[in-house]
Amino acid sequence: KVGVNISTVSGQFSEDYRDKIKGTEKSPHYWASGISLVAHMQSPKVPAFHFNTRFLVTGESWFGGGADMTPTFVNKDDTTLFHQKMEEACRPYDETYYPKFKKRCDEYFYLPHRNEPRGEGGIFFDYMNTGDWETDFDFVKDVGRKTLEAITTIVNQHKELSWTAQEKDEQLLKRGRYVEFNLLWDRGTLFGIKT
């Protein structure tokens, strides 16, 4: 199953949440718009994918987002391809983006109570405002394009493979870890609850 959600929200941050968001010192008001894709395939041979980008306006404005891949069974070729596509999205804009955003992804998508990463990583960025809105927006769009290229290639390579009941059980366990992360650690989930 694949879910794609486009949301635009506005309002006022609560007193207890305001100090966690940049640019709210003078005003608690915000506007945010984003697109999010979460793909959990029926086949345990096909990884789960997550992608989101957003633009947020408070007293300041910025882009954020990223993409990551969570396979049930690690396939190094898939991991290499996914990271190659993320690097292709980043490189034209700044040579430092990919290593910096990959590191942030590795740190962010981590289950500290289990001492394990959620998946094989990707990129994660926030508070992006270089002063050139058009270039920043072009980067965000390229992250989406390259994510789609990676997903399409990987899904097409594995979608027809057969699997066993034991492999399906492994996939369900991995999905449980995914849910744990979202409920315990995900800033986007918290933002949605708080707004």
Where do the model's predicted regions map?
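Glycine-rich, often proline-containing surface loops adjacent to acidic residues and nearby aromatics
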Residues: 2, 31-34, 61-70, 116-134, ...
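A generic structural motif
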Residues: 41-43, 57-59, 69-76, 127-139, ...
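Hydrophobic, aromatic-enriched interface-forming segments
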Residues: 87-136
